[in-house]
Design a protein with these regions (language model features):
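Cytosolic, long alpha-helical scaffolding segments
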Residues: 1-143
């Protein structure tokens, strides 16, 4: 019988898979809300948050690829730093977008619909940061 040897703990693999699933859940949730709430306009902040999620996911891919053999730890930490920076940018975009909604949107229902979509997108960026945290934990345990 052959055993599958993992490069790191099963708990870390589970944490990584769960965090990745959370990103997908929030991205799906934002699209689902747009559909269910019949939102026909994608606002600039929504586009910006989607772009930031995409950047975060690209860095997640880079980081996870480097975790396979743990030879290029610096590349993983660089990805994690970029993901953390992306999440901070997303917080700013979200805060400004919500402030703009409260300032300019006179229809309370439209305000709520847009805020819900923005919130789901922003939470996806938070989950990207969670993945970065798991990758950093794996590095610390295996360095």
């Amino acid at each position: 019988s052959k055993n599958f040897i993992t490069p790191f703990d099963r708990e870390d693999i589970h944490a990584l898979a769960s965090a990745l699933d959370d990103i997908a859940d929030y991205v799906h949730g934002s699209a689902n809300r747009m559909y269910l709430y019949n939102l026909t306009t994608v606002t600039e902040p929504m586009k910006k948050l989607a772009d930031l999620i995409h950047l975060g996911c690209k860095d997640i891919h880079k980081g996870i690829s480097e975790l396979r053999d743990l030879k290029n730890i610096r590349n993983v930490t660089d990805s994690c730093v970029r993901i953390n920076s992306m999440e901070n940018q997303a917080d700013y975009v979200f805060d400004m977008a919500v402030a703009d909604l409260f300032k300019n949107e006179t229809n309370a229902i439209e305000l709520f619909k847009n805020k819900e979509v923005l919130n789901a997108l922003e939470r996806a960026t938070d989950k990207c940061e969670d993945v970065a945290n798991v990758m950093e934990t794996i590095i610390v345990k295996n360095a």
